[in-house]
Design a protein with these regions (language model features):
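C-terminal beta-signal and adjacent terminal beta-strands/loops
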Residues: 643-650, 674-756
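N-terminal periplasmic accessory domains that precede
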Residues: 94-99, 144-147, 166-169, 181, ...
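Flexible loop and strand-edge segments within Gram-negative outer membrane beta-barrel domains
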Residues: 278-299, 305-366, 372-391
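Membrane-embedded beta-barrel scaffold of Gram-negative outer-membrane proteins
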Residues: 266, 365-379, 476, 484, ...
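Short, acidic, small-residue-rich periplasmic hinge/interaction motif at the N-terminus
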Residues: 32-36, 42-46, 75-79, 89, ...
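Gram-negative outer-membrane beta-barrel transporters
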Residues: 444-448, 541-550, 570-652
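Short acidic/polar hinge/loop motifs at secondary-structure boundaries
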Residues: 63-64, 169, 185-212, 300, ...
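Extracytoplasmic beta-strand/coil segments of soluble accessory domains associated
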Residues: 145-186, 206
């Protein structure tokens, strides 16, 4: 057979060029985490040798890909793995920008609050919610108090229309039932619960962990309703320098600065400074009272880390906080402080804190943790002075020991509380020392089952021995389906003047009808966590809970029996908080993210067979957070908001024209962030888009704002208000009718600068 050489050469040529043509497929793009590009990420086609790493700007390109269908995978330390299917025909050039999720925003993040041990969230028997700095940036605020407004089931409650102080409600329970920690230490408590939630530099926050339900076995009596643990950064994760400043159209100014400083080879320090100023009195609702309290605040935070042999822990941290705030009549100046001519509420707060952790230099893992804070408050509410000092010391030893299937934590703690004020209710200095012992055993029953048992013993000289049991069960159906059941008890001693702002402000008299007994509670919580990874890179997380809390000896302010009094006594019955809560988190490869949360709850009190809703508790809440990134112009958009159902409000009796219930109301915000300049972020937007304020539908918010000292109020022989032509509704001055902020729509603009 004669072979035509020329024809053979043509055949070989077309075969080679055809194969080359068939492999001339490429895919390129950028990998980011919605806040910045991710360098050195591994990206490859599974089952092939085609792969690369992203450059410093997060870009990548894969070349010479044969026709076919592949699974493209991305992996990098600190982020969730990403995968999606891609199909090539011939000579295709695809562009695919990929958004990967930091581990801190997904299921496998590390949490420490639930068991005092660092474990992945999926392995924790206690359901812990985690919120990262990325979440906080979506609605920038000047304080942690404001930042939590978009967390489902958590509501910052403003307690006074004049001074705007507040506390944090979890699942409908009042602020004193919530324990706030910094790095696991009970720094923010007592007076600090009301006045100390501001000034924690956001630049140094690593994450915020939230437990909804009792945590009293590990943390003591204050963690009855829930716990918020603010965890600060370690030096490995902190930037070398960070600055964040913003202003609003109301004249608010906030600046947050952080830096990492090396102190030799074995020590380093984090420094954070927060300064906030608002000095522009505004009265948009026309009652001659400031809508927003004026504030001048500075906070300085330092954290030292020391390197030791075998990576043993040694860290120290400290914070100094000073604030001068006032609210009141528009014409008030400091010369009227404490007088009865012009009404003002003026609060000077000086506070310092220190906390630390030291792991003993022994074979066993024994950790000593301690904290101490000193809180001094010089305040006047009209012509009523409130001068208070509180000092809280805390020390704790924990021994972490594993024995077979048992993971033990044994600890002892001691808490010292000093309190003194100038009120008639405090006749002498109150000093209390409470020693404690606790043990916790997490038992691995099988690969998918674990059981946690805990018991705490406290001794309070006022109330004797206190036992607080706790149990938790975790059933890991699959890696993507987890059920948790938690139950426990709580015990709490109430201090009215550090916890109840209404006891100090307004014209109502405070009446304590009996020696108050400690509150006791029982709680049960059932939680289901589900995660879904779709083939196209979409991630869905569902976190749902059913909760029930029953209080005995509950101490609740009674505004209804006598409109001129706030009566405190132990409830002759029970107080119940029950409901369901769910969060659904969507993350799409296009860069769109959506987080939706909703809570339905019933918070009631039953006394003498009569059940009614508690004051200032909503029947439903909703939160949302929608984000989208337009990569080609380096722009991201965040739309956040919340909605609250009606609440029963404290009025001054049947003749009070103010509504007994709040309407359904919503606060919504939008933000635009541009990241087109290296190391810089520019952001701006509008807060309270609907311009909602509580005065809508009400004749007034503050009763008798024109007569705050009740100089023109007539009383009968029994102390009851008499209706007169000047006071037809028989009212007294009352600023406690408050359920939301009086600050309306406003614009904001800010700048972030970061050096890594």
């Amino acid at each position: 057979m004669k072979i035509n050489l020329k024809s053979s050469l043509y055949f070989i040529y077309f075969l080679i060029t055809g194969l080359a043509y068939a492999q001339n497929n490429t895919i390129a793009g950028t990998i980011s985490d919605n806040s910045e590009t991710v360098p050195f990420a591994n990206i490859y086609l599974k089952g092939t040798k085609i792969g690369t790493s992203t450059l410093e700007d997060g870009s990548y390109i894969l070349k010479n890909i044969p026709a076919g269908t592949y699974k493209l995978q991305v992996s990098v330390l600190g982020y969730q793995d990403f995968s999606t299917k891609v199909t090539f025909k011939n000579n295709e050039h695809k562009t695919l920008d990929i958004t990967i999720n930091p581990a801190s925003e997904q299921l496998e993040e590390m949490v420490v609050t639930g068991t005092l041990k660092a474990v992945s969230r999926s392995e924790s028997p206690v359901p812990v919610e985690v919120y990262s700095p990325t979440f906080l940036k979506k609605n920038p605020t000047a304080s942690i108090f404001e930042a939590l407004q978009n967390v489902n089931g958590v509501r910052p409650q403003i307690n006074c229309n004049v001074c705007n102080t507040g506390d944090i409600h979890i699942n409908g329970l009042e602020g004193p039932y919530t324990l706030v920690l910094i790095d696991g230490m009970p720094i923010v408590s007592g007076l600090g619960t009301v006045y100390g939630l501001s000034g924690i530099p956001n630049s140094l926050i690593e994450q915020i962990e939230i437990i909804k339900g009792p945590a009293s076995t590990l943390y003591g009596s204050e963690a009855v309703g829930g716990l918020i643990n603010i965890i600060t950064k370690n030096t490995l994760e902190a930037p070398d320098f960070f600055a964040d400043a913003f202003v609003t159209s109301w004249g608010e100014f906030n600046i947050d600065v952080g830096a990492k400083i090396n102190l030799g080879k074995k020590a380093d320090m984090l420094l954070g400074i927060n300064y906030f100023n608002y000095d522009n009195p505004i009265d948009n609702n026309g009652d001659n009272f400031t809508d927003l309290t004026l504030q001048d605040r500075i906070s300085v935070f330092q954290k030292w880390n020391f390197q030791r042999k075998e990576n043993r822990i040694f860290s120290l941290a400290g914070r100094f906080f000073y604030e001068d705030r006032w609210g009141g009549e528009m014409q008030w100046t400091p010369e009227f402080r404490g007088g009865d001519e012009i009404y003002g509420e003026s609060i000077y707060t000086r506070r310092w804190e220190i906390l630390g952790k030291y792991q003993l230099p022994i074979k066993e893992k024994v950790l000593f943790s301690f904290s101490y804070n000193d809180h001094s408050q010089n305040s006047v509410y009209g012509d009523t002075p409130y001068i208070a000092d509180q000092r809280i010391g805390f020390g704790q030893f924990t021994w972490d020991k594993s024995l077979g299937s048992h993971d033990l934590l044994i600890g002892s703690a001691i808490r010292y509380n000093y309190y003194d004020d100038n009120t008639t209710a405090t006749t002498s200095v109150d000093e209390v020392v409470i020693p404690s012992l606790f043990i916790q055993d997490e038992i691995s029953l099988a690969k998918q089952h674990s059981l946690l048992l805990g018991m705490r013993y406290d001794y309070d000289k006022r109330h004797g021995s206190i036992y607080t049991p706790r149990t938790a069960y975790r059933f890991k159906i699959t890696d993507n389906d987890i059920i948790r059941l938690n139950a426990g008890t709580g015990f709490r001693v109430v201090n009215l003047f550090t916890e109840e702002h209404a006891a100090l402000t307004g014209a109502r008299d405070v009446v304590v009808t009996e020696e108050l007994k400690p509150e006791q509670s029982f709680n049960v919580n059932l939680n289901y966590l589900k995660k879904i990874y779709a083939d196209n890179g979409t991630f869905v997380s569902i976190d749902a809970s059913v909760f029930y809390t029953n209080f005995s000896n509950a101490i609740l302010p009674d505004y209804d029996t006598d409109p001129n009094k706030i009566i405190y006594d132990n409830l002759n019955g029970k107080s119940v908080s029950k409901g369901v809560s769910a969060n659904v988190d969507f993350s799409f490869p296009s860069g769109f993210k959506f987080l939706l949360g909703a809570t339905l709850q019933d918070v009631s009190q039953t006394e003498n067979g009569v059940t009614e809703r508690q004051i200032l508790t909503e029947s439903f809440t909703g939160t949302w957070n929608a984000s989208y990134e337009i990569k080609n112009i380096d722009l991201s958009i965040d739309y956040t908001g919340n909605i609250y159902g009606p609440m029963r409000l404290p009025t001054l009796g049947e003749s009070d024209p103010r509504s007994d219930y709040s309407p359904t109301w919503s606060i919504q915000n939008i933000q635009f962030t541009w990241k087109g300049l290296e190391n810089f972020e520019f952001y701006g937007g509008i807060k309270n888009l609907l311009d909602w304020t509580p005065n809508r539908g009400n004749p007034f918010i503050i009763a008798r704002a024109h007569d705050p000292f009740d100089k023109n109020v007539t009383f009968d022989a029994n102390g009851n208000v008499v209706a007169t032509p000047n006071n037809p509704n028989a009212l007294t001055f009352d600023p406690s009718y408050v359920y939301g902020p009086n600050q309306g729509i406003r614009g904001f603009f800010g700048l972030r600068y970061r050096i890594n």
